[in-house]
Amino acid sequence: MSSDAENQASLKTYLRCLEEAKHRLAFAESFAVGSTGHPRVDIESACLQFRKALELIAYAAIAPHREKYSAWRRQAKGSKDYRKDFNGKKILHSLSRLNPYFYPRPLLPAVERNGAKHFEPFRGEYLTKKRYEKAYDRCGAILHADNPWGHDKQYENFSKEMPTYIEWTRTLIKLHSVLIEHSGGVAAWLVEAGDLTTKARGYIGKGIGEISVDPNYYG
């Protein structure tokens, strides 16, 4: 089980990644609305910034699981150094094998009940893990030059979808919880990424008794 100092260091790394991701999303949004006047350049620039934001979310997800992730990566056939990992989609796949509930769980604002704050799950639209993977792949394809004998990358369609993906991503990280499995049981982080006018902040909690998890919630 990690020490309090290690947990705080991991949380600090997590928040730093989310801070940068927020700004990357803002840059992606500015390009998505056509800031350069060149449609192809706009969507390619938006994809670059958005993909970097997705990778930062993946890096953030490593932070609370770093010890287990590092040990698991040392058993890999190829590169064994997790510090060289860069593919967001592959990072998510690896983390899923270590903790199926690692993915951020968006929440509604707190409600006061009996002197305590309660956070209900957000049930609307957000960037699910499946949507993350789809967006990551689509951005990757668009970032390469067009092969004149290849397939249509559907620039125009993805350009129209990009604002929705950005909004889903903001919803994912704005206020969420992270469940962490360790030798002492289950811990939970509560994280507020906020917006560009506020700094991301987080709180480390420890499970008391059982923590109920709905497997269908994590998609």
Q: What are the residue ranges of the model-derived segments?
A:
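Extended intrinsically disordered or low-complexity regions, especially N/C-terminal cytosolic tails and loops
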Residues: M1-E29
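Generic structural concept
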Residues: K22-L25, E29, C47-L54, E133-Y136, ...
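N-terminal interaction modules that seed assembly of large macromolecular complexes
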Residues: S30-N87
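A generic structural signal for ordered alpha-helices
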Residues: E6, R24, F31-A32, H38, ...
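Long, charged low-complexity segments
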Residues: S3-N7, G78-Y218
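Short, solvent-exposed segments of well-ordered alpha helices
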Residues: Q8-E19, G37-L48, S70-A71, F122-E133, ...
